Amino acid sequence: MTVVTLGELLDAGVHFGHQASRWNPKMFPYIYAERNGIHVIDLVQTARLLTHAYEFVQKASQEKKSFLFVGTKRQAASIIAEEAQRCGGHYVNNRWLGGILTNWSTVQKRVEYLKELDAKEEDGTLDRLPKKEAAFLRREQEKLSHNLRGLINMTQIPDIVILVDPKRETTALLECRKLGIPIISILDTNCDPNLVDIPIPANDDAVRSVKLIISTLADGILEGKQSYQ
């Protein structure tokens, strides 16, 4: 029994890969066919691996593990924020600042500073400051919020990272590998599945495809939480 049907995957366009000329040969086991120069992803494999990932995050969630969702490409950004917040995860959906994981103690200080600025905005402190100073602090707040808002409740390095498009998120991928953090990732036909722990072969350019995969993983996390709530 899989957590999604082949029909649902098909309807979301999960099967559309990249141009065959752009493929990574390591994705061969997950490719069903080539049509008009485009690789077609084997949805049986996608359903199997998505189910495996779902069960993995569900169990991890039962054990109160923490999750970080990463996807900065335009098609994924809003989905990443929405689904991470829905299941109580953390997220990066604008720009990955080098060292978020490998230099977390420094990044955490910036997150704490953002919290301070938020508190000053909320209690009216900024409104009582001289205009120039208030304007400067609001610019700081906006800049930090842009890149770190999704980490506002993160107190330590996450236990599991969920990625969209590891080719784009190379720095995040390398930081996870350096620290031994398990990676679950949507992989299109141009990616290397050997770099992640649980690959989910899928179209990473279509909003509906990304939404289906990421929301299914968020569902798994929520289901795991129900066991202790």
Swiss-Prot record:
Compartments, as annotated in UniProt: Plastid, Chloroplast
Pfam (any one): Ribosomal_S2
Record CDD domains: RPS2
UniProt GO cellular component terms: chloroplast; mitochondrial small ribosomal subunit
Family: Belongs to the universal ribosomal protein uS2 family.
Record keywords: Chloroplast, Plastid, Ribonucleoprotein, Ribosomal protein
InterPro entries registered for this protein in UniProt: Ribosomal_uS2, Ribosomal_uS2_bac/mit/plastid, Ribosomal_uS2_CS, Ribosomal_uS2_flav_dom_sf
GO MF, any single term: structural constituent of ribosome
Highest taxon of source: Eukaryota
HAMAP family named in the record: Ribosomal_uS2_B (MF_00291_B)
Protein name from the UniProt record: Small ribosomal subunit protein uS2c
Protein's GO biological process: translation
Regions annotated as coiled coil: none
